[in-house]
Amino acid sequence: MAAPGIHHVDLAVTDVERSLGFYLDLLGPLGWAEQVRYPTYRGTEEVVYLARGEIRDGGLGLRPADSGTHRYYDVGIEHFAFEVDRREEVDEAHARCVASGANIHFPPEEDRDEPGYYAFFVFDPDGIRVEVFCWER
């Protein structure tokens, strides 16, 4: 069982399958996979959940948005982060994003204020900023 805390995040996206491809490319090699699809409460579309391990331990949901693209610093989510175990995993995830043509916001680097905190930032297909990091404490 996972530790108490944030369990899952659902993102409203313009194209669920496109976003699913992005997140599977980014997170698949880290053990994340599509786990389940459910009809939304509207009943006209599906929400797709990805997780690393059991879906009951939390994950990421992708559901159809009602309107256009997210703009960085609009009201809503500014960014969210995925933690990995090693710097090499950060570098590998970054390389996959570069190879896919994703919009990189910041390349991998160590944080100047937090020793051992190593991260990169990328925008998903809808402009939502995603961080992949490791923290060698």
Per-range role (PLM):
Residues 2, 6-14, 71-96, 98-137:
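Vicinal oxygen chelate
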Residues 22-26, 93-98:
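Short amphipathic alpha-helices in soluble, non-transmembrane regions
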